[in-house]
Each structure stands twice: as C-alpha cells, then as structure tokens.
Amino acid sequence: MQRIIKNNEVVDETWHLLPKDFNIDDISNCDDLIVPLQLWREHSRMLKARDGGLGVWLDADEEAEEIGDDVAEFQVIALNFPAFTDGRNYSNARLLRDRYGFKGELRAIGDVLRDQLFYMHRCGFDAFALRADKDPYEALESLKDFSVTYPAATDEPLPLFRRR
C-alpha cells in the first residue's frame, strides 16, 4: 500500500486514483475514487450518486476554473505534476483555495519531490503523493525547511512586514 503525506503526517493511501483511460463500467459503488476531469465531465451525475467518496484530478494543462463551480462536490482534488519542472498546478492550487474556497484535501500527485513540498504547502496543498522512489518520512521534514516566510501566500495571507 502506498503511503502519502497528509496533514503533516505519513498515512496509508485509502483513495483509488483512476487513470484517464479508465472504463466507467468498472467503477465500484463504495470505493473512494479520484477520477480524471474528463470522466467527471462525462459522468458527474452517476459519480455523485455513488456511495463512496469522490475526488477529481486535474492535469497540468487543465484549469481550476473548469471545476470552480463544482468544488463542493469533492472531498479531494488532486493536481498532477507531470515533471518536476512543471509548476502550472501551483497556480491552480492557489485558485482552488483562495478564489473557489475549496476546504477539502488538496493533493499533489505525479513527479512530486521533497524540494517542492514547502512551496506546495504555501499554495494550499495539504497532501502529497510522492514519486514511488521517494521516502515520505524523509520528505515530511521539508515542511519545516524555513521558519519564516516573507511574501503572502495561502498558508499565511499577511506578508512579513504586516505581521509585526
């Protein structure tokens, strides 16, 4: 079983992340699922009628605005980082938290590495599914890499000069 970082601790993964090519006929009624955006668009009524938990995941080329009106439907929103160098979903995280008021779990998935976690957390992420070859316990320490931050962000809306 995969382990993820959630709310500053390492826990067992309990959600099933469905791939983009998943067949909707194979969906369980009671499992907790994180579905790709396209599957949500095509089958939202059926997905909402299930008994299990519901989440959605966006790829880096998909926009937060596409689910802005639906965020209350999801317990989890996962944002995919296809490469360490692709930072587009940092912006989506800020939009989901600050503009759309998403209060559920915001999870980073894909090519997620230790060096990114502190900055992802500042943008509103509270869960991290690290790349399979990385140790979540070691990566957890990165959330304490810096004790003071200067600019405002989702995790601290006041810049340092306003906190005095």
Question: Where do the language-model regions lie?
Answer:
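Active-site-adjacent beta->alpha loops and helix N-cap segments on the catalytic face
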Residues: L39-M46, F84-L96, Y137-D145
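Glycine/Thr-rich beta-alpha phosphate-binding loop at enzyme active sites
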Residues: G53-L96
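Catalytic cores of alpha/beta
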Residues: V56, E65-D69, R114-A127
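Glycine-rich phosphate-binding active-site loops on the catalytic face of alpha/beta enzymes
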Residues: F125-L143
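C-terminal helical cap(s) of enzyme catalytic domains, especially alpha/beta-barrels
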Residues: Y137-R164
